[in-house]
Every structure is written in C-alpha cells, then in structure tokens.
Amino acid sequence: MAENNTSNIGFEKQIWDAACVLRGNIDASEYKSVVLGLIFLKYISDRFEAKYKELVEEGDGFEEDQDEYTAENIFFVPENARWSAIAAAAHTPEIGTVIDDAMRSIEKENKRLKDILPKNFARPELDKRRLGEVVDLFTNIQMIEHGNSKDILGRTYEYCLSKFAEQEGKLAGEFYTPSCVVRTLVEVLQPFNGRVYDPCCGSGGMFVQSAKFIENHGGNINKISVFGQDSNPTTWKMAQMNLAIRGIEADLGKFNADTFFNDCHPQLKADFIMANPPFNLSGWGADKLVDDVRWQYGTPPAGNANFAWLQHMIWHLAPNGRIGMVLANGSLSSQSGGEGEIRKNIINADLVDCIVAMPTQLFYTQIPVSLWFLAKNKKQKGKTLFIDARKLGTMVTRKLRELTDEDIKKIADTYNAFVDGTLEDEKGFCAVVTTQDIAKQDYILTPGRYVGIEEQEDDGGPFEVKMGRLTSELSELFTKSHELEAQIKERLGAIGFEI
C-alpha cells in the first residue's frame, strides 16, 4: 500500500497537542515563534544533557568544554538555559523571563544562533500559567528517547510547520511548501553536490529535503553549499533554527531582505535552484527595476512577479545549472503584461526542460500550480517533457491531497527516462515535444495540450450488444424518472400546489 507523508505521526502530534494550550489571544506569528522556540530549546537541552552526563561519567573533567559538544554538532547550553532550570521555574510568574534569558544565553555561547532565537516569552499576552503547564508537559517528554538523530526535532519542527500552515490556510505559503512537493523537486533535480539556492526560502524546506535526499542515497552533505534568503523576519529566523538543528550550514544573508531589491548573493551562480515563490505577487516594485540586468527575456509586468522570480533564478544559474520551481498555472499560458513574449523568449533559448501539471489541493489555496524545470545545458536539446500529474495523489483530509512515495517516484522516473532518451509518450500522462511544436501552440506550456487524453480500454464486446444493453438501461432510467415525477406532482397537489 502507498505510504503518504503524514504516516507514522505520534510523537510529533504529542508535542503539537501540548503546545496548543498556549494559543490564547496572542498573534498567530508570535504563537508560531513561541511554539517552535520552545521545541528548539527543549531538544537542544536534551541533547546537551545527554552528552554532559556522558562526559561526567568519563571522569576527565571535560563536561564544561564547549569543543566536546561542537565536535558532535551539539549546541552548548549554559547552566541557566538548561531545561532543569526552566522546569524549576515553571510555576513562577517569572517563567517567561527565565526562558527569554535562556535564549539570550544560548545565543551568546553559540554564535550561529545570534539574533535568531525568539525572546518573546515574557510578553504580557502570553499566559504564564499555561506556559508553565506546557513546560511541565515538555519536562515529561524526553525527545532523544524517540531517536538519537538530529532528524527527530526536524520531524517535529516540520510537523508543527504543517499544522500552522493548516491553521493559516492560504496565508501559509510564505513559510511552508508541502513536503511532497519539495520532495518531487528534489527527486527530479538530485542535488548531490554543488551550490543549492532558494531565493525565497521560507522555513528552509528545500534545503532540508536536499540534505535528506543526499543522506538517503549515501552521499555526503558536506558536498553541497546552501544559499538563500527571505524577506519575512520571522520566517527567516524559523529557517535559521530549522537548518541549525539539522546540522546544515547555510548562508541566508546577514538579515531578512527583499530578493528583488536586496539580493544577498549577487555574485552567486548556483548549480541547483529550488523555490516556491509567492503566487502571482503584485506590487513588487517593478517600476523601480525597469532596466534590471536580470530581465534578459523581457521586463516582467508590475501586476505579477511570476516571471520576475523565474528570470531572477535564470540569472543566478551556473553554466550547467538547473532550476525546479513552483508557479501558478497562469504562467503557462498568460499573454498579459508581456508575459507571453517573456515565456516565448525563454522557450526559444531552450531553457525549459520539463513542465509538470500538479494535482489540486496540494496547497492551502485553490490556485492550481505546476512545476517548472529549467536547465542551462539541457541533455535533450530542442525538446521539452510535459507531464500531466493531475490525477496523482491521495486525499489525506477533506481539503488536502498529498503525493505518495509512488507518485513522486513515477514523476522522477519519467523525467530520468526523458533525459536518458528512453521515454515513450504515454497518452494522458506524458509527452516529449519539440520547440517547433510548442511554437505552433503559441508557446503555451499547458501539459494537457500535449499529452492528449488517456486511452480507454475496449472490453472487446460487439457494438450492437453494447448499444442494446445501454439503451435498455436508459429506458429503465426514463421509467424511474417518470415515476418520481408523478410522485412529486401528487405530493405538491396534496398541499395545494398544482403543476
């Protein structure tokens, strides 16, 4: 049976349920940083305490030596920031201040975390009694007992991000891309080594999945260099924490910044670029960037930043670089604001490698999306692969769909066969199309135009027999319809309404 991405959730849900009692009246973004910050603090304290105990038992007096912890990618936790100190203050009015001070102490001892951790636990809006109750609950949960890998907090962190996304609906796009979508991008691009870049990195999901991919395939995570940025200060800090506990070294800029106006990596030429930019962003400042060097294929319209994001990424590509990104479906066919001409120029430059039409309801928005894969040095020159994946996926809630592992593999395998030159078109699912044929379709990139309609199996029965059966069934339906019509008229007449 296909396994989806919400399987095996137990410990993560336990943490989430415990944290939910904090909701109260505080702002959603503040609540998010409080919950994720508390999870972060508990986990790094657990890891530190385990190593501390081990060093004490060795008896060499190295338990306060920071190098002993750094060598194993464990953050050094000062005495006032250890969970035992937090737990002791759980039922005091000062619990918020104690946690804030703990965060400051951790930042001071671990330069990588400077100005990253949330320090808003003392704010009046946060109910200190409830905060103390959550501390008690966390005290009874030993996170490292659920696994000794840094991935444990990562899973919890990712689960909580998905729950926040569920709560915030369409507003969640700024910090969260569904993991099955990210995994699809990663499985197609296969970023084993080189420079990986996300110009709108949210909470860092693209980087996390890249690291997982490398580890799952026996690669070396140190062979990739991670670069990114995000304009939202809260989201930027979430990404820093997310990557820190995964042990992923990253350059996300010195502060949060607008990618179009303050590119943190102006000289970067990346080998892999993965992104889920804000859908159809308007008011992005186009009038101030009219002659920008990045607009090699045409100036993007002021009312929609889709092709600004796309061209920004193309500008940052290395000579053999590749892009995997999420875009709203309108970008496949739009002719407004010069978008059609930009798309035409990008296609004629032989940059479009593959387009995947994705199923609906993968995101917390009704906007249909596609995956764009572009390459500076395509293996299949003058050809583009179209995949119509709209029928893939499984509903995991009434509103949300996920791609299964098998779905993701099917897309990745199809792409790999295309690159190898062994792919055969499959009606209704995939087709390899020349640039000339795309031009004949006015440079529209909607996969449905090219893959055709799925072939229906013929049961082999004679036409006359089928028609006889179908007309008989239709006659029965007509008879039932007349009977129902008569009953309705009779009941309406009984209450004084004649038809």
Residue ranges and their predicted role:
Residues M1-F192, D251-C264, A357-T360, K381-R390, ...:
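Non-catalytic, mostly N-terminal accessory regions of nucleic-acid modification and defense proteins
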Residues Q14, V21, E30-Y43, W236, ...:
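Conserved Class I SAM-dependent methyltransferase catalytic core
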Residues N25, W284-N304, G330-E339, M358-Y364, ...:
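Short, contiguous acidic/charged loop-to-helix segments that flank catalytic cores in large enzymes
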Residues K42-L55, F164, I214, G218, ...:
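A generic secondary-structure signal for well-formed alpha-helical elements
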Residues P124, H146, C200, G228-N232, ...:
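Hydrophobic alpha-helical scaffolding
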Residues L171-A275, N280-Q296, L327-G330, G338-V352, ...:
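Conserved S-adenosyl-L-methionine
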Residues K269-A270, N304-N306, N320-R322, V326-A328, ...:
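Active-site lining segments that contact anionic ligands and/or coordinate catalytic metals
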Residues N348-V352, Q361-D413:
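C-terminal, active-site-flanking charged/polar segments
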